[in-house]
Amino acid sequence: MSTEKIADEIKFAYWVPNVSGGLVTSDIEQRTGWDFEYNKRLARTAENNGFEYALSQVRYEASYGAEFQHESTSFSLALLGATERLKLIAAVHPGLWHPAVLAKFGATADILSGGRFAVNVVSGWFKDEFTHLGEPWLEHDE
């Protein structure tokens, strides 16, 4: 296998900082911009440097310093409008979206962006996000 072939297969992505504070649970202080202007600059920089994907996380509340959160699907759609080639992957909790509504949103976003929208279905791990929104919490072994 040639080295050139391997290089063609490598794809780069980054995690969109659409929450305040930080992106991961950590005792280490984290500071990222989370406003739209910062994210537009970051998305365009990533796109211009060969990144193919960006993943927008979903949070409705967080205990790790991410006090404020932008909703992942609408934030991703806005970033798609600010870029030309970058593909946006929006994380969603399936229990909080009716499947038909998510399918319709996703199909529309994909058409509007020229095929650059995708969904990452996640199980979620903050119990309060579900219970505070009136959804049942299933233990992860259920």
Protein language model regions, located:
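N-terminal beta1-alpha1-beta2 module of alpha/beta enzyme domains
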Residues: 1-82
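Flexible, glycine-rich active-site loops centered on histidine and acidic residues
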Residues: 7-33, 95-142
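Short, well-ordered alpha-helical packing segments
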Residues: 40-43, 77-80, 93, 103-110
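Active-site-proximal glycine-rich helix-loop-beta segment
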Residues: 50, 84, 113-115
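Hydrophobic residues within beta-strands of alpha/beta enzymes
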Residues: 54, 88, 117-119
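Short linear capping/connector segments at secondary-structure termini
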Residues: 57-61, 92-93, 134
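Glycine-rich "substrate-gating" loop/helix at the edge of Rossmann-like oxidoreductase active sites
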Residues: 63-67, 93-98
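Conserved catalytic cysteine-centered active-site region
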Residues: 82-90
